[in-house]
Amino acid sequence: MKQAFSVCVYCGSRTGATPEFATLAREVGRWIGANDGQLVYGGGNTGLMGAVADATLESGGRVVGVIPKALVEREFAKLDCTELHVVDTMHDRKQMMAERADAFLALPGGIGTFEELFEVWTWRQLGYHDKPIGLLDAAGYYGPLLAFLQSSVAHGFMNEWQMGLLRIGSEPATLLSQLARDSGAGTDESDFSDI
């Protein structure tokens, strides 16, 4: 029997300047729960992290939180996760999150979100995994970043095929459905232990 779709969501520990960000984070969580899926995320209880986790739990989904000891108090760890893993380092956090996921999805966030997105994108281009990566461009948040990335292509530092590794969308259900289809929903056996 195939396991449920497990998606690693990267997003802000803040809600951002517009309510649309939290609304879309909750839509992501509701989709995961309604599809008997599993959220893997950074284990926080605030901002978009808290919104997506709450909505997943309220909709019947599983929530796997992974948080370093040093951030437990700072990010107000979500103690009612289905599973909450307190790890030693950020590297341990990212490795466990990657291992537990069938796909990755970046919602709006700050430099931590950017770093996580770029890391799994780099791993994908290098062949460390073949899991799909989505970018939810809520309220045009990622528009300037996408323009910059196209500039990098135009200047010869990236190729179009690298851009093609990202699934970009503004509608949570459509993007999540595409990621689930592309992932094989639990069939990937990538090993992140040597990264």
How should each PLM-predicted stretch be described?
Residues 92-127, 134, 185-193:
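Active-site/ligand-binding-proximal alpha/beta "capping" segment
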Residues 1-100, 139-178, 182-195:
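A cross-family phosphate/adenosyl-ligand binding-site feature
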Residues 107-108, 132-136, 163-166:
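Flexible, glycine/proline-enriched loop segments at strand-loop-helix junctions
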Residues 110-112, 126-128, 139-141, 172-173:
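Short acidic/polar capping segments at secondary-structure boundaries
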Residues 62-64, 126-139:
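Gly/Pro- and small hydrophobic-enriched strand-loop and loop-to-helix capping segments
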